[in-house]
């Protein structure tokens, strides 16, 4: 037996012994997702137990170094961990912008003190983070942002507004792009971390067409941010932001992969499955989702050894977005007119149509599909500009 085969056997046995049965079922609503944080309310004891046993082993961030709360797995071992979790249908023990976005940025740009302070909290699910990038007048043209940090010696005094801040009303801390030099558009932005409980921080939820409010407006009114909470170099926050955006797009693109039966299974139980055209669409989706998952694994392997194309995350984001939208279009097609019911048992109390509506935003968040296609054309296909 090879070392990797032995490792797979070890992980398989550990999962069988430690993953509660309740955590081996698909997440049906927001309460089934463990976000962690100071004020997070566990849905049940199984959810709490699953986070605690995984955090104790470093399995919430398996490929992070052990000294920062991870398990120190190699790329091959982390792939086995993901495969074995998928095999039993295990839910992620922790979902976190800290894991998906801030953590990788801190590992690359953070000071040793920042890594030791923040990464362990992220890995254990003790702090919930949100991202402060977009502003009312700065979306696709992010470098035009106006939130300003006035240098006061040992701290910055931050004033401004962010928008589309996911779960800002529930987050403990925010990683934020702040202008610290008004004279230079690109080299005048810094990447700051600050506590959402700081005086002067306020949030206002934004109601979406789906009926939910996962996004917020976030306001900063004379918020004091210590100089020790600067990540990377002063006025070079755009370097950190570009690196982090790649991880954000990987996160959003992940919605297109996952369990391929997530679209096919529900459709099989509905009358629409008898439609031969729908059956053909389901088969095509299954093939494309499998190809996408394989592409994602290849990309992760390349990133781990420093060979990933800088623009590949744009491609993953675009394809993942389109797949996720297709997935939910198939839900609706299979359900027929009844799938539009907002309050019925067959649609999970309206979860099916609400989620279908929510997926329309996938084409905008994290960079619009049009912007992604432009980047792919220029940086991967090397097509000439207009």
Task: Walk through the language-model features, giving the residues of each.
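Amphipathic, small/basic residue-rich leader segments at the start of a protein or domain
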Residues: 1-96, 117-124, 266, 276-283, ...
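Glycine-rich beta->alpha junctions and the first turn(s) of the following alpha-helix
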Residues: 200-294, 362
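Glycine-rich phosphate/cofactor-binding loops in nucleotide/flavin-utilizing enzymes
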Residues: 76, 80-81, 101, 240-254, ...
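A short core secondary-structure module
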Residues: 146, 154-155, 159-202
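A short, Trp-centered hydrophobic/proline-enriched beta-strand micro-motif
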Residues: 125-133
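N-terminal glycine-rich flavin-associated loop
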Residues: 94-113, 139
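Glycine-rich phosphate/pyrophosphate-binding beta-alpha loops
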Residues: 163-168, 209-210, 361-366
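C-terminal helix-coil-helix/basic helical segment that borders enzyme active sites and/or dimer interfaces
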Residues: 25-28, 273-279, 290-346
């Amino acid at each position: 037996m090879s070392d990797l085969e032995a490792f797979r056997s070890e992980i398989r046995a550990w999962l069988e012994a430690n993953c509660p049965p309740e955590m081996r079922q698909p997440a049906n609503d927001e309460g089934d997702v463990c976000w962690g944080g100071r004020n997070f309310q566990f849905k049940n004891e199984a959810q709490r137990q699953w986070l605690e046993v995984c955090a104790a082993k470093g399995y919430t961030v398996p490929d992070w170094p052990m000294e920062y709360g991870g398990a120190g797995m190699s790329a091959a071992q982390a792939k086995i961990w993901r495969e074995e979790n998928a095999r039993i249908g295990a839910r992620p023990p922790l979902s976190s912008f800290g894991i998906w976005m801030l953590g990788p940025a801190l590992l690359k740009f953070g000071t040793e003190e920042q890594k030791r302070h923040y990464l362990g909290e992220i890995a254990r699910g003790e702090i919930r983070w949100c991202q402060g990038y977009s502003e009312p007048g700065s979306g696709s043209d992010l470098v035009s942002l106006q939130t300003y940090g006035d240098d006061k010696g040992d701290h910055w005094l931050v004033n401004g507004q962010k928008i589309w801040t996911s779960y800002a009303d529930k987050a403990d801390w925010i990683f934020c792009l702040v202008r610290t030099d008004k004279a230079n558009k690109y080299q005048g932005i810094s990447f700051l971390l600050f506590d959402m409980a700081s005086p002067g921080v306020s949030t206002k939820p934004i109601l979406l067409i789906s009926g939910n409010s996962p996004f917020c407006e976030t306001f900063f009114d004379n918020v004091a941010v210590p100089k020790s909470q600067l990540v990377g170099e002063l006025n070079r926050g755009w370097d950190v932001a570009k690196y982090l955006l790649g991880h954000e797009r990987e996160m959003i693109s992940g919605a297109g992969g996952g369990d391929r039966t997530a679209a096919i299974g529900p459709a099989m139980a509905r009358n629409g499955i008898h439609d031969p055209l729908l059956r053909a669409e389901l088969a095509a989706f299954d093939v494309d989702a499998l190809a996408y998952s394989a592409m994602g694994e290849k990309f992760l392997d390349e990133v781990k050894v420093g060979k990933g194309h800088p623009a590949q995350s744009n491609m993953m984001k675009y394809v993942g977005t389109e797949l996720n939208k297709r997935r939910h279009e198939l839900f609706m097609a299979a359900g027929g007119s009844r799938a539009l019911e907002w309050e019925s048992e067959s649609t999970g109390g309206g979860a099916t149509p609400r989620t279908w509506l929510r997926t329309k935003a996938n084409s905008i968040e994290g960079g619009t599909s049009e912007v992604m296609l432009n980047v792919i054309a220029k940086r991967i296909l090397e097509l000439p500009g207009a």
